[in-house]
Amino acid sequence: MSQEIGIFADILQTNKDKSLYMKSFLKSFFSVMIIVTACVTIFSSCKTEEKYDFVFDVPGQITAAFGAEIVIPFTAENITSISVASQPKGWSVVDVDMVNWTITVKSPTAFTADDSSVEENGILKLTGYTSIGTIVYATSYLSLLNQQIDFTDAYSNCYVVCQKDTRYTIDVTHKGESENRITPADVKLLWQGPKAVVQYCSYDSAKGEFTFFVGHEDITNDDKEVVDTRMPGGNAVVAAYDDNGEIIWSWHLWLTGSDVEASAIRTSAGDFMDRNLGAYHNGDGSVDGDDIYKSYGLYYQWGRKDPMPRPIDYSFTKNNDEYVYGSSDEFIRWKYYDDEDGAGSAEFAAANPLAFVLGSKSNDYDWLYSSHDDTLWSADKKSVNDPCPRGWRMPAGDAFTAFDIDELEDMAQLGDVKGMYGWHLVDRLTGVKMFMPGAGRRSFENGVLTNVNNYGDDYSPLPWIGYYWTAGTAGSKSTSLFFDLNTTRAVNNNYEPQKQMYRANGMQVRCVRE
């Protein structure tokens, strides 16, 4: 009996040991699973938060030389290796320097128009690999150009850009055409309109030069097939910055359809440009909306070099500005300042080219708040603030007294001339004509665009009016050309060649040859 009890006790002890073993095993298993889960979670978290950066320092590289080696800097963080994913035909990658973060590219050694083995332009694509194997791409535009224009010896506040598919270089160490020199810490594209008409910008601080590229726009037929290309139209402003990131000067890039030198109009009052400053062309009285719009130039407050944008379309829809963009394609808005914003000085205006300075009532609606400065523009000697390109200047205060509205247009029926949005002016001495668009003005009170005369009503405002600044002054005001379209008066259309206006108004400019 005692033997049977012992056997039974052994069985119980064995089962107890097995139970304890299973408990220990399960406890260990779940502990391991918890640890594994924690490790997976940590690893997953680390992977999600992986930091890296791989980008070229400038978006594009342009060379005018065959077989040239170009050293392109790039920024890389947590990139352990790099390979070339693709490159334009005929281009080669000579070296990838992982110490100094540069890549050396060689342009094609030869090129002909029918050579399919060479691409004049294209994208260089690099593949970067992070420490845990993440793949990252960086791209840069490469272009081999035979066309380049150097403006560095012809420094000015405004540069006429009228050749497509060309690299341009400008001086960024002079204020206007003066010998007043600056040393910018940086130079960048401030705004442009339309988007991406100015590309691949770079600043060479050692030379004090800024380089940019202007391509082309396609011309298509009715079947949307590209049949040709042309110079793109638009405007841009480039700004120089000091070490604190403050603007110290800026320059206007005027992308226009043809050479303004070749198309100048000779009159008894001087040689005038055939188009407004900032316009693509002169519509010459066309009633086509696109032609009218391309005839509109930019707007300037009297005495300032800084251009302000056109309306969004030729008919001034809701008086809205055209869209303009920054260097990263962000939308840019102008700011409107009054005497409570610390504005109202020439220094403030130069440092804030995106500012419309509202007129000060206490100073007779000048954008200068404590005085008037008649020397900001001059017809005798081109001033540092003159907005016209080199070789051109603001017209004298009496320049438009030599003209009048073309008689046939002046006497025509309203329906025959309303759609022209402007008048042909006739030189009374020589009979030479030039068309002046009625592009309105920006109000000195609020900066808003307006292009209606005073003779419509609230429900049916009637276009149009023309205001053009001259360099002339009269007391606290400045001299402008004014004309309008007669819609209700029993007299001919209004033409005032020396109308005195508040200096805070924004008006069109028609430059005259020096």
Can you describe what each PLM-predicted range is?
Residues 16-19, 36-62, 66, 135-147:
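Bacterial Sec-dependent N-terminal signal peptides
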Residues 75-81:
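Short proline/glycine-enriched turn/loop motifs at strand-loop junctions of beta-rich domains
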Residues 129-137, 244-249:
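Short, exposed coil/turn segments at beta-strand boundaries within extracellular/luminal domains
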Residues 114-131, 232-242:
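A short beta-strand micro-motif common to beta-rich folds, especially ectodomain repeats
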Residues 146-382, 474, 503-514:
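Short, compositionally biased
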Residues 108-117, 219, 228:
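Short, surface-exposed loop/turn segments at beta-strand-coil junctions that are enriched for proline
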Residues 3-44:
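Sec-dependent bacterial lipoprotein signal peptides
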Residues 237, 279, 357-514:
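C-terminal, surface-exposed recognition/capping segments
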